[in-house]
Amino acid sequence: MPFMPHLTKNMFKKCFLGLCWLSIYLQAAAQTPIGPLGQWREHYNNKSVQHLAKGNVLYGATTNQVFSIDAKNNIQFLGKSNGLHEIEIAAIAWDPIQSQLMIAYKNSNIDIVKGDEIISIADIYLSKVYANKKINSIQILGPWALVSTHFGIVVVDLIKHEIKDTWFANNTRQAIITYQTISTADSLYALTEEGLFSTALKNNYITSNQWKKINGYTDAKKLSSFNKTVYAIGNKNIYQLPITSPIYQTSIDIINNAFAHKEGLYIIQSNGANGSLLNLNTNNTTTNILDKTFLAMPVDMAIDQNTIWIADSLNGLIVKNTETKNISLGGPSEKIRGTGFVNSDYLLAPFGEKVGGFSSYSDAGWKNYTKLNGVNLPILTAASIDPLDASWWFTAGASLLHYNISSNSIETISPNALAGNYTQIQFSKDGIFWGLQDGQGIVQKQDNKWTSIPLPINYLKNGLKKMVVNSQGQAWIPGPANQGLYVYQSNKYFSTTIWKQLNTSKSSGNLPSNTVLSVALDNTGSIWVGTDNGIGILNCGDISKDICDAYLPTIKNTNGFLGLLLQRESVNCIAVDGANRKWVGTQNGVWLLSADGSSIIEHFTKNNSPLPNDTILQILIEPKYGEVFFNTANEMVSYRGFATEGTAKQSEIKIFPNPVPPTYNGPIAFRGLVENALVKITDISGSLVFETRALGGQAIWNGKSSSGNKVATGIYLVFVRDDMGNEKSVGKIVITKGE
C-alpha cells in the first residue's frame, strides 16, 4: 500500500504558511509516495472543522490539526506528527504584521507557526497560579495577542513571543472567566462571566486597568465588530451596542456566531443538524444565503472579498463564491471504533458504534462509504478480506455483508447458524471463513458449507470479542472477565470437536491472569496472550493430549531485577510485524518488543510521540511497507516501521532514498528481501563496507562503514544471501556527499 506524497518538516511548514514555491511542491509530488522510515502520520476525522482564520491563505483547525488552503485549493495539514506540540485545538488566530499563526490548545499550551519555526509558549500551561486555565479565544491587536482564558486576559508579545501582561476586566485582579475580547479604534471590550466590560485603548494597549461594566446583554456569548460598530451575540438575540433591544431574534434556531462586515452582519445558526447562513443588512432585514443543503452545525466563518468560508462541526469546510461546494479534507469521516483489517492493498476500518459504514485506505488515500452499490450500510463492527477473491466482508449484527469489488455487487448473508451478533471475522490463507458470535460460538464456512460450533458453556452477552485461528485449525478466544482463554480444536470434517479452558493454574494454562484481553498469532506459530497483568506465550500441540502452559517472559526492570514482561499492564492488543517483533497496545501507550519478548525496543506515549491518547484499542500492520496503524481512544495515527514482510523469492529490491542526497542523514532502506536475509554492501571494487540482517523483508543502513565512518561519494553494490546460503547482486546505490 503506497503512501501519499509528503514534504519534509521544514518544507511543509514553509508551504503551510503559503511560502512554498510551485517547483518545491512539484518536486515533492514527484518523489516516491513512500514516507520515510520512522515517520508518523495522522489519520484523523477531518469532517469536523472548528475554527477559521484568514491570512495570506485560509487557515483552519479540526479537533487535532490545523490546515491551510491556497488559492488553487492545495491543502496542507500541520499536526503533532510534523511539528505541533499538542492536540485538541481550542482557538487559532492569524497575525498579519508578523505573518504568523497562533494556535491555542485545550490544555492551555500555545504554539506560534512562523516561517519554518514552531515556537511553543508554555507559560500558561506550566503556571500553577490558577486551577482552571482554559483558553476560550484569541484576538490579534497590533503587536499583541489577547488570549481570553478562564482566569483573565493574557497579553502575548507577538514579536518577542513571550507573556507581556495579564488583565482582569473586573478591576480586582481576581480571576474572572473571560470568553472573548473585541476592539474598535479607541476601546477594548471583554465578554466575561460577570457580563460585558470596556476600557480605553491607545496605540493598541489599554491606557489604564480601569474597566467599566456595560449593563444589559446578559445573554451574550460572542462579540463582533466592524469599524466603530460592536455587536453582542446571544443564543437567540443579537444586539448592536449601545442599544439594549435586539436587532435580530430567532425563536427556533440557535445562533452559533455572527460576523460584522461593511454591509451588515453575517449570522450562522442551526436547529439540530440543520444549519443556515443569513445576512442581516444595515436596515435590519435578513437575506438567506445558505441552508441545510450544505450546512449542519456551522460554528465559524472567514471572509475574503467575495468568498465566504464556513467551518461546520458536522459537514466540514464549505466555500461560497460563484458557486457553493464542500471542500474535502480527506481522512476517515468518523472515528474508527470497529475492528479493522489490513493487507498489502487495503485497510478496512468500520465506524462501529453509532454510524453505518466504513472507511478504506489504499494508495489513493482514504475513501468513506455509507453506501455500497446504492445500498445504505448498517452499523458494521468488524472487517476482513477473502484472500481467494479479494472480496470484502463485514459484520452487521447477526448477518454478514459481502462486497465483491470486481463486480461491484453486494449481498447480505445470514447463514443458518447461531443467533448472536458477530464480533470478529477472519479468513485462513486457504480461504476458510471463521466468525465469532458473541455469547454463542464459532461459525465457519468451508467448501461453501456453513458450520455452527456452539460454545461448551453459557456465556453472557458482550463476553466474546476477539479470536485468532492458527494453521492447525485451532481457534483461541479470550473469555469474559476472569474466565481465562478458550481453545477450540476439531478434525478436518468436524466429526470431533474439543474445547479447552486455560487459566492461571499450572498444567491448566499458567496464564499471567484470568482476565484475557487480547490474543495474537506470531510468525512461528506461537500464541501471544495479553492480559490485565502482562503477557504469556503458548506453544501447544494437540490440546486433547498435551498440557498447554504459557511461558511468562521476563525482562530487567529499572532497578536491574528480573520481572514479568509488562507486569500490571493491561494488554489491549498485540500485532506482529514482518520481523516477528511484537507491537503491544496498552493503557499506557505502545510497546515494541523483540521477537521473543526479551527486550523492549520502543515505548511510545502521547508525551514522546504523536499518539493522541495512551489508550490503544487496536494495532494493524501493513505488511508490504511496514506502516503500523494505531487506533487509540481518540483517533488513528500510523508509524512507518522498520520491518516488512519477507518475499518468497529474491529479486531486484527497492532502495530508498536512491540516490542519497548530500543533506540526507536518515536511514537507507532496502525493501523486498527474502525473510531474514543477510545484506552485504560493497564498494565498486568488491570490498565489504557494511553488512546487516533484514528485519523481515527490509534491511536498514545508516550510510556508514562498519567502523562508523560516513562512506565516500560513489556507487555501492548490494548483495543478498538467503538462509540457504545463496547470494546474488540485487541492486546499486549512489551516495553523494556535500562539499
Task: State the predicted function of each range.
Residues 1-37:
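Bacterial Sec-dependent N-terminal signal peptides
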Residues 25, 647-680, 698-701:
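Glycine-centered coil/turn sites that cap beta-strands in beta-rich domains
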